[in-house]
Curated annotation (Swiss-Prot):
Topology of this chain in the membrane: Single-pass membrane protein
Keyword Transcription regulation attached: no
Cellular localization per UniProt: Host membrane
Principal location class: host cell
This protein's name: Protein P55
GO CC field: host cell membrane; membrane
Spans through the membrane: 342-359
Keywords: Host membrane, Membrane, Transmembrane, Transmembrane helix
Length: 483
């Protein structure tokens, strides 16, 4: 069956084609395209090379693409009661669905049937004519009574006695002697979950949960860590999303967001204890690292961000001072290279890669270079690290530590992953020239078990032995910031 006839409900092929292309054209779609989403399915219609293209929908037939684009552009995705996948399959299908069309208003798969659609046309016309002269409430009453009786009823006249057809259905259930009634806790949980799904069936509420998805994901990770759960507990995800939307604060500062997420988690703890008799450990201090930092948060809150990062992928020692050191060095790098608009994560990775290449020795015969060439958004930029070196020296002098080494040992896992991702294989060890270059940095001995199963264990063992037994200390001239 012709796709254009199918999607428009117009039986004349030429008229159906004209109707489709009155909507599916460059002018209507616009230069930026149009996006649509429903129940997790997302599509974007764009005009490309004199034809419509749909992100999220592919077909070898251009007429099928045009038909589905017409369906989207006419608002079909937002008005249909069917699952978007079913709509895709209907448009793709080549079989004749004429009989199916006759059950829909105007034969369109996105059209909604009116409550009086089963009445004869004359009765429907009478109801429509009566609605024009009746008040809204009387018009609604007229339609409801007419539908129930099965014919048009004039509610302004004396109603004659009639029999209203009612159908009583008896539901037969098979019950075993041991399952006559469910435990109260199970019944309560079923009612709770049913009510939740009814609340989430609202498209606006469901769409709003996307705006808090980052918080829902991190909160779920917190619960999985605290309890013997898996990330597939969909009901927990649904509750998280709904409560985060309902309780979202107007003030979105970091401290308020922490209190907001903790309020939701506290409610979930109560639900878990009520239905499953499980106590969830962890308080606001444990939760705080799982609350994402936003780009608009002030600098002084960056230490919380790095506490979160260290919470997930670091070794244990230095846990108290490393987030503070990271915050100070990252802030210095971002301030010194403000024109590059570095994010905190980018800045931290640049610092770790820099010291993995040039070492973390407190004193050196050869100065570390002041700049590192970094590809940012497709362009190679010179990133200045002179300020980072100076700040690290001051921290080291004040605390009596090697701040660079403490930091890099603490984030050694992240360094390893960054070197592997960016293909950095620089190896300054002549005696270990054979090892994997991505592991050839002087804090590789601090790689934890979280990453160890992804690296060459033999090379890693050689590096650990070399670092622990190496007596060739690097000494000599003072650092550039000591001049």
């Amino acid at each position: 069956m012709d796709k254009y006839i199918y999607v428009t409900g117009i039986l004349n092929p030429n008229e159906a084609r004209d109707e489709v292309f009155s909507v599916v054209n460059k002018g209507y779609i616009g230069p930026g395209g149009r996006s649509f989403s429903n129940r997790g399915s997302k599509y974007t219609v764009v005009w490309e090379n004199s034809a419509a293209r749909i992100s999220g929908f592919t077909s070898t037939s251009q007429s099928t693409i045009d038909a589905f684009a017409y369906f989207l552009l006419k608002g079909g995705l937002t008005t249909t009661l069917s699952n978007p996948i079913n709509c895709e399959n209907w448009v793709r299908s080549s079989k004749d669905l004429s009989a199916f069309f006759r059950t829909l208003i105007k034969g369109k798969i996105y059209a909604s049937r009116s409550v009086d659609s089963n009445l004869p046309k004359k009765d429907r016309d009478d109801i429509m004519e009566a609605s024009r002269r009746l008040s809204p409430s009387d018009a609604a009453f007229c339609r409801a009574v007419s539908v129930q009786v099965g014919k048009y009823v004039d509610v302004t006249q004396n109603l004659e006695s009639t029999i209203v057809p009612l159908r009583v259905m008896e539901i037969k259930k098979r019950r075993g002697s041991a399952h006559v009634s469910l435990p109260k806790v199970v019944s309560a949980y079923v009612d709770f979950y049913t009510n939740l799904q009814e609340l989430l069936s609202d498209e606006v509420t469901r769409a709003r949960t996307d705006t808090v998805s980052a918080y829902a994901t991190d909160s779920m990770a917190f619960l999985v860590k605290m309890l013997p759960l898996t990330a597939r507990e969909q009901w927990l995800k649904d509750v998280l999303g709904y409560l985060l939307v309902r309780r979202r604060p107007a003030n979105f500062s970091y401290d308020v967001r922490v209190a907001w997420v903790y309020d939701v988690i506290a409610t979930l703890k109560l639900v878990i204890r009520l239905f499953f008799n499980k106590d969830t450990p962890g308080g606001i201090k444990d939760l705080k690292p799982c609350v994402p930092i936003e780009s608009f948060d002030p600098f002084h809150e960056l230490s919380s961000y790095f506490s979160r990062l260290s919470y997930e992928m670091t070794t244990g020692k230095g846990g108290k001072i490393c987030p503070e050191i990271a915050e100070k060095l990252v802030r210095r790098l971002m301030e010194e290279n403000y024109k590059l608009r570095l994010t905190p994560v980018m800045a931290l990775i640049i610092i770790l890669v820099y010291y993995s290449i040039y070492g973390t020795n407190a004193t050196r015969i050869k100065r570390r270079p002041d700049f590192l060439n970094v590809r940012i958004k497709g362009r190679v930029e010179k990133v200045s690290l002179r300020g980072v070196e100076d700040r690290a020296f001051r921290i080291s002098e004040k605390r009596g530590i090697n701040a660079q080494r403490v930091l890099c040992r603490y984030y050694s896992d992240l360094t390893c992953l960054a070197r592997r991702h960016y293909g950095i294989r620089r190896n300054n060890w002549k005696t270990l020239s054979y090892v994997d270059g991505t592991l050839a940095y002087d804090t590789a001995d601090c790689i934890t078990s979280k990453v160890r199963n992804t690296i060459n264990t033999a090379d890693h063992a050689s590096i650990i032995h070399y670092i622990k037994t190496n007596e060739n200390q690097v000494t000599g001239t003072t650092l550039p910031h000591q001049l």
